């Protein structure tokens, strides 16, 4: 009886830990990136972050990493707090402002086409990163896991679920034909990730079998 209870406790603890680790956001994440407009990029490129409303952005730095050399070619220090909707948009400055809707900050962030990476750093180190494009054997990948897709001009890459981070860009990001700066999927409308659902189903089956013995 003690063994069955212990296994039940461990199984539920693992399931809870997986869900907590998947959904709890201790820091902002990169939720959308648009780097290649149809025609000139000036004033159209943007980076979108998602985090907890009111969370401080002081000390955060966004870097553009060259995929060919690994050098930091763009660095932007952030400040202030995350807006009430939890979405912070950085719009590229064309020299005369920006054309990015819902921009919370306007700065020179004309990110290069891939293969490259964008890294979000905090005082403790890297908080999030996305590498995009097709990386060759000699290229430098500064993202997480595998590279996110490299969309055609006019499209962006966006996190499928702003509350879920597997640590693999190829899984977490997809192409958006129409960029949506300032808008992320509603948390209530996003289904539980398949991996978490399968794990939960398996654990509940295990518990059921233990109870029937």
Q: Predicted regions span which residues?
A:
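C-terminal outer-membrane/trafficking sorting elements
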Residues: 211-213
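Sec/Tat signal peptide C-region and signal peptidase I cleavage site
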Residues: 21-26
